[in-house]
């Protein structure tokens, strides 16, 4: 959520920032409501001053033995008017908050201006894609042939965009989760959380999924939501708390299943593991001081990249342009892994700095050493999406005979060096 005071003081700057997103977003309604609210508050203060003045007259009149009935009636009328105005103020404030919750974050000044993903900027590459002397099979095909992925039975059980992992496929998924957690905990210094997979509406609002993206979420009949990412419960872990400056940055890593309706994704990557309704992910979440958050974004992105380096998977890092930026993000790097059967790089992680956008919604602050309270900056990134990593391994390490070589760092988890 954007700061109303900042919007009021910098309307042109805010509108200019929102215009960079290439969407029709106007702050005019908020400014109008804010002006209405301030006028109502001024009227309330004026009436309260009159009320206080008249209240002081009552003891004097009583002391003089005079009738206070008329004055008491005036005070009753004033009290009723103040209550009515307070009610109007509450209505206007609720309307302001309702609109604020639908307005996205302002892109950071370092974000390139562009209309969509075609104008994202490649930052760097790592690793060289293999050029095999045989035709690469797509991961779903080789997975089914090896008997480690079963899409057909998953479709029978649950419908489209679900998968059964079987045998060494299930072990590979589990090995990746454990490897990613161990790497981030032991090498990168994150603290592990194992979060609930169901959250309340307030938590989804806190991280920016609601109200704007409710159609993309799976919701229970009693208003709980299946999490689309561990970002939601882990960020809300410190909701409505005041943290200590000396404890920042706080770094969490969490494995969770993720659930997404993928509304509007028809026809996109419909086969295989790339776009599923349910998938596993290891998430990195940070709480940082505002002055440190962009350094922390670079470190977080490097931590996610490190997983791919250890696995030996070629990838590139892309800086998202303003038109492709997520709703809550001020700046995002996408990490894209090379997928041979696609002939292109495919997103496997998004690493974002939300600045104070989520912290304002979730009321997460910290106390500076001088006693001043400030909102933290929140960051997160996939470290990594597990199903997509499985897909990348099956495609990048498949052999001519149809087997798949297990990356060296996974062999102690897998108990084998090859899937055949």
From Swiss-Prot:
<dbReference type="InterPro" id="IPR002314">
    <property type="entry name" value="aa-tRNA-synt_IIb"/>
</dbReference>
<dbReference type="InterPro" id="IPR010978">
    <property type="entry name" value="tRNA-bd_arm"/>
</dbReference>
<keyword id="KW-0067">ATP-binding</keyword>
<feature type="binding site">
    <location>
        <position position="382"/>
    </location>
    <ligand>
        <name>L-serine</name>
    </ligand>
</feature>
<feature type="binding site">
    <location>
        <position position="283"/>
    </location>
    <ligand>
        <name>L-serine</name>
    </ligand>
</feature>
<keyword id="KW-0436">Ligase</keyword>
<dbReference type="GO" id="GO:0006434">
    <property type="term" value="P:seryl-tRNA aminoacylation"/>
</dbReference>
<dbReference type="GO" id="GO:0016260">
    <property type="term" value="P:selenocysteine biosynthetic process"/>
</dbReference>
<dbReference type="InterPro" id="IPR002317">
    <property type="entry name" value="Ser-tRNA-ligase_type_1"/>
</dbReference>
<dbReference type="GO" id="GO:0004828">
    <property type="term" value="F:serine-tRNA ligase activity"/>
</dbReference>
<comment type="function">
    <text>Catalyzes the attachment of serine to tRNA(Ser). Is also able to aminoacylate tRNA(Sec) with serine, to form the misacylated tRNA L-seryl-tRNA(Sec), which will be further converted into selenocysteinyl-tRNA(Sec).</text>
</comment>
<keyword id="KW-0547">Nucleotide-binding</keyword>
<feature type="binding site">
    <location>
        <begin position="347"/>
        <end position="350"/>
    </location>
    <ligand>
        <name>ATP</name>
    </ligand>
</feature>
<keyword id="KW-0648">Protein biosynthesis</keyword>
<dbReference type="GO" id="GO:0140096">
    <property type="term" value="F:catalytic activity, acting on a protein"/>
</dbReference>
<dbReference type="Pfam" id="PF00587">
    <property type="entry name" value="tRNA-synt_2b"/>
</dbReference>
<dbReference type="InterPro" id="IPR015866">
    <property type="entry name" value="Ser-tRNA-synth_1_N"/>
</dbReference>
<dbReference type="InterPro" id="IPR006195">
    <property type="entry name" value="aa-tRNA-synth_II"/>
</dbReference>
<dbReference type="InterPro" id="IPR045864">
    <property type="entry name" value="aa-tRNA-synth_II/BPL/LPL"/>
</dbReference>
<feature type="binding site">
    <location>
        <begin position="229"/>
        <end position="231"/>
    </location>
    <ligand>
        <name>L-serine</name>
    </ligand>
</feature>
<dbReference type="InterPro" id="IPR042103">
    <property type="entry name" value="SerRS_1_N_sf"/>
</dbReference>
<keyword id="KW-0030">Aminoacyl-tRNA synthetase</keyword>
<dbReference type="GO" id="GO:0005737">
    <property type="term" value="C:cytoplasm"/>
</dbReference>
<feature type="binding site">
    <location>
        <begin position="260"/>
        <end position="262"/>
    </location>
    <ligand>
        <name>ATP</name>
    </ligand>
</feature>
<protein>
    <recommendedName>
        <fullName>Serine--tRNA ligase</fullName>
        <ecNumber>6.1.1.11</ecNumber>
    </recommendedName>
</protein>
<dbReference type="GO" id="GO:0016740">
    <property type="term" value="F:transferase activity"/>
</dbReference>
<keyword id="KW-0963">Cytoplasm</keyword>
<comment type="subunit">
    <text>Homodimer. The tRNA molecule binds across the dimer.</text>
</comment>
<comment type="pathway">
    <text>Aminoacyl-tRNA biosynthesis; selenocysteinyl-tRNA(Sec) biosynthesis; L-seryl-tRNA(Sec) from L-serine and tRNA(Sec): step 1/1.</text>
</comment>
<dbReference type="Pfam" id="PF02403">
    <property type="entry name" value="Seryl_tRNA_N"/>
</dbReference>
<comment type="similarity">
    <text>Belongs to the class-II aminoacyl-tRNA synthetase family. Type-1 seryl-tRNA synthetase subfamily.</text>
</comment>
<dbReference type="InterPro" id="IPR033729">
    <property type="entry name" value="SerRS_core"/>
</dbReference>
<dbReference type="GO" id="GO:0005524">
    <property type="term" value="F:ATP binding"/>
</dbReference>
């Amino acid at each position: 959520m954007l700061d109303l005071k900042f919007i009021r003081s910098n309307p042109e700057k805010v509108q200019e920032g929102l215009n960079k997103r290439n969407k029709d977003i106007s702050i005019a309604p908020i400014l109008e409501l804010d002006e209405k609210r301030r006028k109502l508050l001024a009227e309330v203060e004026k009436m309260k001053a009159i009320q206080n003045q008249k209240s002081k007259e009552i003891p004097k009149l009583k002391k003089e033995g005079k009738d206070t009935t008329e004055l008491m009636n005036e005070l009753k009328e004033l009290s009723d008017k103040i209550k009515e105005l307070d009610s109007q103020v509450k209505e206007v404030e609720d309307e302001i908050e309702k609109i604020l919750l639908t307005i996205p974050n302002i892109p950071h000044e370092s974000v390139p201006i562009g209309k969509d993903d075609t104008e994202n900027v490649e930052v760097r590459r790592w690793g060289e894609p293999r050029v095999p002397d045989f035709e690469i099979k797509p991961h779903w095909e080789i997975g089914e042939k090896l008997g480690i992925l079963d899409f057909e039975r998953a479709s029978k059980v649950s419908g489209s965009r679900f998968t059964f992992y079987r045998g060494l496929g299930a072990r590979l998924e589990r090995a990746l989760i454990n490897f990613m957690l161990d790497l981030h905990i032991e090498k990168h210094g994150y603290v592990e959380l194992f979060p609930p997979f169901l959250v309340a509406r307030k938590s989804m609002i806190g991280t920016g999924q609601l109200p704007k993206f409710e159609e993309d979420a799976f919701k229970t009949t009693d208003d709980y939501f299946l999490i689309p990412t561990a970002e939601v419960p882990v960020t809300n872990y410190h909701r409505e708390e005041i943290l200590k400056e000396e404890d920042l940055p706080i770094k969490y890593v969490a494995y969770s299943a993720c659930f997404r309706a993928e509304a509007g994704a028809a026809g996109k990557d419909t086969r295989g593991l790339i776009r599923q309704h349910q998938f596993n992910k290891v998430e990195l979440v940070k709480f940082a001081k505002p002055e440190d958050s962009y350094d922390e974004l670079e470190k977080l992105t490097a931590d996610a990249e490190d997983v791919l380096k250890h696995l030996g998977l070629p990838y590139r890092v892309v800086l998202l342009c303003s038109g492709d930026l997520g709703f809550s993000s001020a700046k995002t790097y996408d990490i894209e892994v090379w997928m041979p059967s696609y002939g292109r790089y495919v997103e496997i992680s998004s690493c974002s700095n939300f600045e104070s956008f989520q912290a304002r919604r979730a009321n997460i602050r910290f106390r500076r050493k001088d006693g001043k309270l400030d909102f933290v900056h929140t960051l997160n990134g996939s470290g990594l999406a597990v199903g997509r990593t499985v897909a990348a391994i099956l495609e990048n390490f498949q052999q001519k005979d149809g087997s798949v070589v297990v990356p060296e760092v996974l062999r102690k988890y897998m108990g084998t060096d090859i899937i055949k």
